[in-house]
Swiss-Prot record:
InterPro entries: ARM-like, ARM-type_fold, Deoxyhypusine_hydroxylase, PBS_lyase_HEAT. It comes from Rattus norvegicus (Rat). Belongs to the deoxyhypusine hydroxylase family. Fe cation 1 binds at residues 56, 241-242. This is Deoxyhypusine hydroxylase.
Length: 302
């Protein structure tokens, strides 16, 4: 049983800007796992922080928790034009993930936002909510991954056909996302290489999602393309950050060199992502039972 005092201690670590970013991330993922109104309240306090990376991760976690009590704070973040585009985008995506149709009107409104990543995110969230209404009771988390995705995976299982849809920029973004998540679920080298080709497509939002999915897939066939995208200083920081975190999750020796090289990058979100990714690399190659270890850090060993 988790006590109120333990949740508070983990929450204080999350919102304490003097703490190392890795510790704050581990606290965040602990709160996400615990759930409930107190966890949501602590996570919501973090949106005043100066780190866009942390704030974007706060929004992501609130979406994954799928608790409608998080809707008001996510709406306020989406509406706040002082928040960085990657933070507003993640708030829009989180509203789609929660799946409550009451935000459909708001998401439609922001589907024409002047920030293209925000507009595209809200368009996808609208399509997801409409899909949920058309397919009541269908599992959207089916498959080997437990994440709540911005689009349900396509029913197609052929990697070649999925690759064609993924890379066809004339197709609706929603259908390309469906192909992306289907490729992830199929898994293996061929799927990883097909996904990695998506890192060269036109939409920055799309490229960043490809980076995220390759991190979930954790296949080393994608390492060279992820490292090349991280190294491309003309690339959107939102995309480079996702590639860095994917390299941390894949956690092969070749990933380590790339992450160390960009830990002093001029873009704050990139260097912070490398910092968090190196912590993830250590976790993947270490003996820790779980990454979200906020409770273990509070409790003495038995």
């Amino acid at each position: 049983m988790v006590t109120e005092q333990e949740v508070e201690a983990i929450g204080k670590t999350l919102v304490d800007s003097t703490q190392p970013l890795q510790a704050r991330f581990r606290a965040l993922f602990t709160l996400r796992g615990l759930g409930g109104p107190d966890a949501i309240s602590w996570i919501s306090r973090g949106f005043e922080d100066s780190s866009a990376l942390l704030k974007h991760e706060l929004a992501y976690c609130l979406g994954q928790m799928r608790d409608p009590r998080a809707i008001p704070v996510l709406v306020s973040v989406l509406q706040d034009r002082n928040q960085e585009p990657m933070v507003r985008h993640e708030a829009g995506e989180a509203l789609g993930a929660i799946g409550n149709p009451k935000v459909l009107g708001l998401l439609k409104q922001y589907s024409t936002d002047p920030v293209v990543e925000v507009a595209e995110t809200c368009q996808l969230a609208v399509r997801r909510l409409e899909w949920l209404q058309q397919h009541p009771g269908e599992a959207t988390c089916a498959g080997p991954y437990l994440s709540v995705d911005p689009a349900p995976p396509a029913a197609e299982g052929d990697v070649g056909r999925l690759r064609e849809t993924l890379l066809d920029e004339a197709q609706p973004l929603f259908e390309r996302y469906r192909a992306m998540f289907a490729l992830r679920n199929v898994g293996g080298k061929e799927a990883a290489l097909a996904l990695a080709e998506g890192l060269k497509c036109g939409s920055a939002l799309f490229r960043h999602e490809v980076g995220y999915v390759l991190g979930q897939l954790q296949h080393e066939a994608a390492v060279s393309e992820l490292a090349a995208t991280l190294a491309r200083t003309t690339e959107s920081p939102m995309v480079r950050h996702e590639c860095a975190e994917a390299l941390g999750a894949i956690a092969r020796p070749a990933c380590l060199a790339a992450l160390r090289e960009y830990i002093t990058d001029p873009e704050r979100v990139v260097r912070e992502s490398c910092e968090v990714a190196l912590d993830m690399y250590e976790y993947e190659n270490g003996q820790d039972f779980q990454y979200a270890d906020g409770l273990e850090r509070l409790r003495p060993p038995p």
